[in-house]
């Protein structure tokens, strides 16, 4: 394999098994080794997943591959042994570490990840062939899930038995340890007693001892005293305290209404305290009503704002807008060669645009393969990036010509294309129009419909001709 741009573009070319090595010019640094490892693993695992027969370009005639207990030599034998892996493989790489070797200026790469949800460990030894050229000297692949299963079974067996094979412990000495642990367990509940008095009272109520009953009796009269102190300070402020006895002198109280004569008897015992409480309740009721009415208004507004239908609609609008900003149209690809399918071209586009950012989808319509003998037709594709930063990086790498069209250098072996392709942001199109290399326009929601028949009235030729002419604008 080969790195062509001072380890910055992460592009590596295989050497097809040519093992004639030359002396290196400069030693590798740790950062350079990590860049070599990242670029190699990106191309290697994509090739294993999509075109497994093409991995011969990474190995030489004397390269070795270790798969568990099997060892093979040579690129052809390595491909046969790689076929033991499942046909549909999904690699998920968790860690890639690259280290320079102390001799031959090689690179050691350790990879940890999962293939079809099964954890594995793979190590590569890259040998240097000339300046900035590498090939795989040795490759070791090993599943690691079986080792963890064996260790867990051993731990279970050791934990179930003691030192002398007894479950209770060694020589029955565990009884002492249980005694020593008891005072520690009793000392733990002590700190919660320093918490607030409300929590302490709740715990005391749960206990049925007579001491707890005495504590409750001693603490209960303190609460009304604390509650009565602030009313005594606020009592001088309101003056209508003297008016309440006049209000209570109704005809029912003067004549005598049987059970209604009890309130004046209760006032004789503690009229001062009860009058203060009644005046406070009388003044607090209107303020309580105002607070409740004021609290209902923001709650109603919050319920309207947090309605599920509104949130769903806002989420859909934001997701649609975000998706449109992440779509790119790639066109202007001349067809020197027409492949049998679009899979190879889509995979090549993924490899080229991966350096700009993560790719969510690459879609090439089937009709780009029509009329293979007609070289005037161009191929095109639709690319969806994972985030907006990737789209921005693509347009920063492109250049704009005199006509305002963005051009991006591109090489696609599937179509034999090596030149500048056109790129533009993909937007929603009106019903009559189409996306043709940036031609056409975006029809906003609620806007006027283009008519060929004039400024007013129906279009010429009826509605049918009007829809046909809409795509020609």
Swiss-Prot record:
It holds the Pfam family RRM_1. Phosphorylated. Residues 173-187, 198-218 have a biased composition (Basic and acidic residues). Disulfide bonds: none annotated. Keywords: Cytoplasm, Phosphoprotein, RNA-binding, Stress response. PROSITE patterns: NTF2_DOMAIN, RRM. One of its GO terms (cellular component) is cytosol. The keyword Lipoprotein does not apply. Residues 431-444, 453-464 have a biased composition (Gly residues). Residues 300-320 have a biased composition (Polar residues). Residues 326-420 form the RRM domain. It is found in: Cytoplasm, Stress granule; Cytoplasm. GO terms for molecular function: mRNA binding. Residues 155-320, 424-473 are annotated as: Disordered. InterPro entries: NTF2-like_dom_sf, NTF2_dom, Nuclear_transport_factor_2_euk, Nucleotide-bd_a/b_plait_sf, Ras_GTPase_bind_prot, RBD_domain_sf, RRM_dom. PANTHER family: AT27578P, RAS GTPASE-ACTIVATING PROTEIN-BINDING PROTEIN. Plays a role in, but not strictly required for, the formation of stress granules during heat, oxidative stress and starvation. Does not play a role in temporal patterning during worm development. This is Ras GTPase-activating protein-binding protein gtbp-1. It comes from Caenorhabditis elegans. The lineage of its organism: Eukaryota, Metazoa, Ecdysozoa, Nematoda, Chromadorea.
